[in-house]
Curated annotation (Swiss-Prot):
It holds the Pfam family PGI. The gene is pgi. SUPFAM superfamilies: SIS domain. GO terms for cellular component: cytosol. It comes from the Bacteria. PANTHER family: GLUCOSE-6-PHOSPHATE ISOMERASE (PTHR11469:SF1). InterPro entries: G6P_Isomerase, Phosphoglucose_isomerase_CS, SIS_dom_sf, SIS_PGI_1, SIS_PGI_2. Its main location: cytoplasm. It catalyses: alpha-D-glucose 6-phosphate = beta-D-fructose 6-phosphate. Its EC number is 5.3.1.9. It comes from Mycoplasma mycoides subsp. mycoides SC (strain CCUG 32753 / NCTC 10114 / PG1). Coiled coil: none annotated. This is Glucose-6-phosphate isomerase. Keywords: Cytoplasm, Gluconeogenesis, Glycolysis, Isomerase. NCBIfam families: PRK14097.1.
Length: 427
């Protein structure tokens, strides 16, 4: 369901790949012997997810869905990016479905939080708070705000039915709070890190409340697991990892993920965390960036075309079938001179822009373009691409000889912030 097309890189990957190394790393992955192997639980998750808990989540989600208009998903990083990526990719940006998902706990902006409070005052809403520890600053202080808003609105007894916590099975501040107050809880597995957790209750529960078919998401992930099993470049995930690593070793610094669909913008944000937090260690790693074309062709396109060379390459998501399409209307006066486009649909024009940009950037601009060919934007495709990118990332990180599953660098800013805020115990 995803094909890696390297025709626009001017590279014969079979001549540059160290296939023995790929095979060696493949064995490290499947045998769980590489760095950070305690966090490879996602590898077999499409088979091994807790079916009993999944059915419980469906029941709770259906009840919640019948009572609310809005679900406030409170989390940061991997605790919300995957869910939001799925929601926007599958339902689009202006869907008319019964339950709206909105997001908090991913910022400390007072203006954003205030406006969200005002928006919710006249809405029937529930809360899904997501945190392994329950002590992460952004979701912690946001949950205080929205929990109070909900309790003040409906009372404590009713609020118990409208708040769900996704957290550790046995310990942590959020687990302790939820048990004390009687909130329903579901489990974040110990062997799956946050940025790999979208197919766990972290992403699946709020998506169930939204009405998205999560069975199809699991089907897509399982299909990827069953297809991406080879230890050579017929494995499309490994093919993507190898070409990225080759370009990195040639001196390229940035991999820009390009989408021509606005509803994939949050997918690119999820991808940036997945690759950036996993690879950016020991002074190594490509900088993951993203652009939305054709929008950014009118702002960053000049830099892409004529800026410094051998700094950035592009990974382009090409969608074969849009969720919807429409034609360009005829205008009798034709003042804009665009009637020649009325023979084409918007998707055909968008695809033509994609082809034109690839030619401009890869041929004229001499910038490698990797094309990821997706069939469509639906629930099954989302499950597939999650597994594809997680496997590609793991191979890519091991090719760099870094641990894909830790993130020690993010603790530095937290320490400085806590010290400035006079947090007890911080010197």
């Amino acid at each position: 369901m995803i094909k890696v097309n390297l025709d626009h890189t001017n590279i014969d990957i079979n001549k540059v790949v160290d296939l023995n190394k790929v095979k060696q790393i493949h064995q490290m992955i499947i045998n769980k012997t590489g760095k950070g192997n305690d966090y490879l639980g996602w590898l077999n998750w499409p088979n091994d997810y807790n079916k009993t808990e999944y059915e419980q989540m469906k029941q709770v989600a259906n009840k919640l869905r019948s009572e609310i208009e809005v679900l406030v998903v409170i989390g940061i990083g991997g605790s919300y990016l995957g869910c939001r990526a799925a929601d926007e990719m599958i339902r689009g940006l202006y869907h008319q479905d019964k339950v709206e998902l909105i997001y908090a706990g991913n910022t400390m902006s007072s203006t954003y939080i205030y406006q969200l409070v005002e928006y919710l005052k006249n809405k029937n809403f529930g809360i899904c708070v997501i945190s392994k520890s329950g002590t992460t600053t952004e979701p912690g202080i946001s949950f205080r705000v929205f929990e109070k808003l909900l309790v003040d609105k409906v009372g404590l007894n009713k609020a118990k039915d409208l708040i769900v916590a996704i957290t550790d099975k046995n310990k942590g501040a959020l687990k302790q709070l939820a048990d004390k107050k009687g909130y329903q809880t579901f489990v974040i597995p110990n062997d799956i890190g946050g940025r790999f957790s979208v197919l766990t209750p972290v992403g699946i529960f709020p998506l169930l409340v939204s009405g998205i078919n999560t069975d199809n998401i699991f089907n897509g992930a399982l299909k990827a697991k069953n297809e991406l099993i080879n230890d050579d470049l017929s494995n499309q995930a490994y093919k993507y990892a190898v070409i990225r690593n080759y370009l990195y070793n040639q001196g390229y610094k940035t991999d820009a993920l390009i989408s021509y669909e606005l509803q994939l913008q949050m997918l690119t944000e999820w991808w940036k965390q997945l690759f950036g937090e996993s690879e950016g260690k020991d002074n190594k790693g490509l900088l993951p960036s993203s652009m939305i074309f054709s929008t950014d062709l009118h702002s960053l396109g000049q830099w892409v075309q004529e800026g410094p060379r051998n700094v950035m390459f592009e990974t382009i998501i090409k969608i074969e079938k849009p969720n919807y399409d429409l034609n360009v209307p005829i205008d009798e006066d034709n003042y804009d001179g665009l009637n020649y486009l009325t023979k084409n649909s918007f998707h055909q024009i968008n695809q033509t822009a994609l082809k034109g940009a690839i030619q401009a950037h890869s041929v004229t601009g001499n910038m490698p373009n990797i094309v990821l060919e997706f069939e469509k934007m639906d629930d099954e495709q989302f499950g597939y691409l999650v597994y594809f990118f997680e496997l590609a990332l793991t191979m890519s990180a091991y090719l760099l000889d870094v641990n894909p599953f830790n993130q020690p660098g993010v603790e530095v800013y937290k320490y400085n912030m806590f010290k400035l805020l006079n947090k007890p115990g911080i010197k």
